[in-house]
Amino acid sequence: MKFAALALALLLAVGSHAASMQADAPSQLDHARAVLDVYLTQVKDMSLRAVNQLDDPQYAEFKTNLAQRIEEMYTQIKTLQGSVSPMTDSFYNTVMEVTKDTRESLNVDLEALKSSLAPQNEQLKQVIEKHLNDYRTLLTPIYNDYKTKHDEEMAALKTRLEPVMEELRTKIQANVEETKAVLMPMVETVRTKVTERLESLREVVQPYVQEYKEQMKQMYDQAQTVDTDALRTKITPLVEEIKVKMNAIFEIIAASVTKS
């Protein structure tokens, strides 16, 4: 499978890549192994997710066997990686020892090359800066011309819009006043109707309210001269009568509201 072939190739690459590492390569080699572990885990998880996409019942046994096979291959690769690691370390140490002089000489050559290229690097920097200045000189007039025209167009648009906006404000104010003129009679009509209805209700309810107030005053006056038991005996019939009259008031109000 591609999974196994790719994993084995990466596994061997970690060992062979050790020959090109610098003096701090042991940590780099460990890092490469850690990256390989993460990659192998990701490939395994992706493969299992792909297998789990087979939802049809006829694939159930095949899906189980394939998932088990992927887990076994992952375990085998990890085992092989563990057995290869000592050989990789030994090979790396040998290569680093054998190539020590060559690497040191190469570092010296690289530093010398870097020093010799410094003047050319500065010259290259100056050439690039000159080219950028040429481009800037060429493009600046075009940009300035565009900006000037754009500013002029915006100013012209603003000039054209000013009278339109003033006319629009005037029309809006006139429309508001016109709407108010049409709306106010409607509001007054509603207010008059509500006032009339409330006045009618007040006239209907007023006799009952007055009678209720007189009865309450009578009960209060009697409460000042009789004992509690006698007061309770006298109040009970009045309370019942008040309940009946209050119910009548509510019925009148409800009927009046319904008619409106």
Curated annotation (Swiss-Prot):
By which gene is this protein encoded? apoa1
Which family is this sequence assigned to?
Belongs to the apolipoprotein A1/A4/E family.
Spell out the GO cellular component terms annotated for this protein, sorted alphabetically and separated by semicolons.
Answer: chylomicron; extracellular vesicle; high-density lipoprotein particle; low-density lipoprotein particle; very-low-density lipoprotein particle
Q: Looking at the Swiss-Prot or TrEMBL record, what is one Pfam family this protein matches? A: Apolipoprotein
Q: Signal peptide span per the entry?
A: 1-18
**Region annotated 3 X approximate tandem repeats, chain positions:** 32-63
Query: What is a single molecular function from GO for this protein?
Result: phosphatidylcholine-sterol O-acyltransferase activator activity
Instruction: Give GO terms for biological process.
Output: acylglycerol homeostasis; cholesterol efflux; cholesterol metabolic process; lipoprotein metabolic process; phospholipid efflux
What is this protein's function?
A: Participates in the reverse transport of cholesterol from tissues to the liver for excretion by promoting cholesterol efflux from tissues and by acting as a cofactor for the lecithin cholesterol acyltransferase (LCAT).
This protein is called: Apolipoprotein A-I
Organism in which the protein naturally occurs: Sparus aurata (Gilthead sea bream)
Q: Which tissues and organs express this gene's product?
A: Strong expression in liver with lower expression in intestine.
